[in-house]
Amino acid sequence: MKRKGLSVFFFLFWVALAAQSSETQPVNSVQLIAWLMAGVPSGRLVRIVKERGIATVPGKDQIHQFEAAGAAANLLQALAASKPSKASSEASEIPTSLLKAAADAKAQRFHAAELDLHPALTADPQNAALHFALGGMLIRQEQWDDAFDEITLATQLMPDLPENHSSLAYIFYRLDDGPNSISEARTALSIDPQNAEAYQFLGLALYSNGQYAAAVHAFAESLARDPANADTYYDLGITLRAGGNQAAAITAYRQAIHLNPAFWEAHSNIAVVLHEQNKLDEAIAEYREAKRLAPEEASVRNNLGNTYCDKGDFDAAMLELRELYRQHPEWQQGHGCLARAYLSKRDYANAIQELQVSIRQNPTSSSEHRMLGEAFVLDDKLEEGIRELRLAVRLNPDSDSAHHFLGTALFQQQQLEAAEKEFREALRLNGSPDNHYSLAACLMTMDRYQEALSELDAAARLDPERTLYRARREELVKLMKETNSR
């Protein structure tokens, strides 16, 4: 990993120096279009023009170039109404390669935009805005080390631009370096206390550090300055959920959708919260909307399939997951859910196949080995089932269901003492009626009727509505009387 940051002293030194130099220097069209293509909002660029001035007023051709690059109406109006700064009257042509890069960035062809920027940087290697633009393209490709290098260069060349520091804050956040991320975001805010993006990235950094209340406050400060930012509401929703406030999280996600109706990730995250609340029908509706907006997104179809499984709608689950693997054969999740669907259809062969795939991807999952063992037992493959169930117990000795199913398999193999041991361990871990009943069945087979009767009494006492327990108790009492009368 490359060096993760410059010292706070280094930045404060350059910021102090910048107060005497960069702060009074007007910006030019090259810088503005480079910042624009890297994602700096038009409203923020308007403020930069007002604060710093502009070297030369763009002509009609350049205004059209800004419009083609994605400038909003407020920036176009500000440029057209601007007056040249007295500090400079030098014209600034926008390089063709930069215009091409801006067009590619607008079309989300980020790698092409990255390549387009190289000629412009070769011609002007000390241009901080061009390094910032290149860093922005690398960020969008998640090339964090290279992005760090470019944004660091931009910061060294123009240390008083808060966007340089907030971009570093975001890179550090993605590198899971919360302290440096917080430091950079606060540096950005020390330069520009009204910078909404810096507050947003401060919120992300605090969230990554587990400081949820402070993160919520930072996001609120960001939204106070940029209330139409759907991404910030989305980040706020994630943080509120992490802090345990599910209702507020859903409200934040819905506000993100209000601002950006195509925000499928927000629909998906609402569904996650609803699933956690066991509101499965509502969760399914949100996942379906996310799927409508992003039909090729594998995670949405996977989560929708799993929610159908939890609801017990195995036909719908199978449709979703089969389509998922058709679209994305490389996708590795969801095989356990598909196995459950096959088990519900008593299609043990396909269930076993899916569980074996799932176990290859996660060999230490006790629950997957337990399900595979159960499938083998149901398919009358007791030896294979016992092997998997013993492994499930070793991986998670505190799983009552693993002990229960292992006991069941051993019982079917007439290994009664071993089965009794597993049933008793399952009962120790979970005193459920079914665990009492299974132990009773084992004890009855071993002719230990009095002990079996005690277990059946316990099962019936715990679940008096279950007629099976009472019926089996009556059978046992009758059997005991017949045995005693002989």
Regions found by a protein language model. Name each.
Residues I94, A128-A129, P162-E163, A196-E197, ...:
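Helix-start (N-cap) detector for alpha-helical repeat units in TPR-like alpha-solenoids
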